[in-house]
Amino acid sequence: MKETRSKQPDITPDMLLRAYSIGLFPMADSADDPELFWVEPEIRGIIPLDRFHVSRSLAKVIRRRPFDIRFDTAFSEVIEGCAQRAPDRPTTWINDTIRALYAALHKMGHAHSVEAWEGDTLVGGLYGVSLGAAFFGESMFSRRTDASKICLVHLVQRLRSKGFQLLDTQFTTEHLKSFGAVDVPKVEYEVLLAKAIASPNLDF
């Protein structure tokens, strides 16, 4: 995996969008480290939108509508949820610089959140970046069983309905593979990315 170190003051929202358009995304070593670095994986994770898979058990849960699913009503709160430590996530790479950059992208209409609510309580969500006909998933969190999974299902439904071509997950995990995520070589990913980026920016 290639990394390029860059001091955080150099990165602007416009630079961040440009980076996404050529296959780069930023990370930090920890929440307390102000420095960001660019990541360019040799193997990229994507979820082919036409091969997204929902298990029977999860489909059954979704039919019960356990959560109110909303879009872009609590973007900063979703990032905070993703930044919090959890039993399966003892450390986080989301620092103050990441928060500020993605908040700016949200105001520009390029960063979005999918949220699971129980009444007035946010119990799960995910966020990512839209550019052209591509959506780049960044992070997700869950405070109730299946909350983030259900947000992912609603994200894919939204992307399909709007005509998106690419859902980039950056890396794959066993969790994402259960939904149909696959690893693709960098060269193949670049072709998919170029096609999606060539599209006008789609409404999310």
UniProtKB/Swiss-Prot annotation:
Keywords, ordered alphabetically: Acyltransferase, Cytoplasm, Transferase
InterPro entries: Acyl_CoA_acyltransferase (IPR016181), Leu/Phe-tRNA_Trfase (IPR004616), Leu/Phe-tRNA_Trfase_C (IPR042203)
UniProt-listed GO biological process terms: protein catabolic process
Protein location: Cytoplasm
EC class name: transferase
Chief location bin: cytoplasm
UniProt xrefs under PANTHER family: LEUCYL/PHENYLALANYL-TRNA--PROTEIN TRANSFERASE, LEUCYL_PHENYLALANYL-TRNA--PROTEIN TRANSFERASE
Name of the featured protein: Leucyl/phenylalanyl-tRNA--protein transferase
